[in-house]
Amino acid sequence: MKKKALTISCIVLLALIGTLTGGSLYMLNYSLRPENRGKDLQGSMEYMMQNYPQLKPWVDSLQQHHALKDTFITAPDGIRLHAYYAYASRPSRRTAVIVHGYTDNAIRIFQIGYLYNHSLDYNVLIPDLRYSGLSEGEDFQMGWLDRKDVIQWIDTAPALFG
């Protein structure tokens, strides 16, 4: 009788461990690899223009004058990271580094860049975090490696804006 109870207990325990492990791996994959709208640059621009139509003249002007620029840096682990940047309308020492949210990209935060660049006359640097936009990466980092990347972008800003 004890042997049968022990066998059943072991089977239940193994089933429970298997279920918890499988569920945990599923949730980890779900949280680190959600639908990546951050790689859809065209869709992101359409979203911005549809939801923030006041941005169109600003973005068009930046593009027409080649004032919206791209730059890349390489993180210490070899991942290539991308950012957009734009100068203030006159030389300025004020720079805003504007960071997008989870699963987004730099384009989806242009409305904040507009406020700083157009309204407050700041230089703006808007990076694509890992696995977003034109940046490389296999997973969203949920801020862990992104914090170091943002510090690297902050250190890069003076070289971009003088």
What are these regions (language model features)?
Residues F140-F161:
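Alpha/beta-hydrolase active-site loop
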Residues A5, L16-F72:
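An N-terminal hydrophobic leader/cap segment in hydrolases
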Residues Y102-L115:
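The serine-hydrolase catalytic nucleophile loop
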Residues Y116-E136:
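Conserved alpha/beta-hydrolase
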Residues R108-F110, S135-E138:
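Conserved catalytic-core motifs of eukaryotic protein kinase domains, centered on the activation segment
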Residues P76-Y87:
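A short loop-to-beta-strand scaffold at the N-terminal edge of the catalytic core in hydrolase folds
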Residues H82, H100-G101, S132:
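Histidine-centered divalent metal-coordination motifs
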Residues R93-G101:
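Short beta-strand element of the alpha/beta-hydrolase
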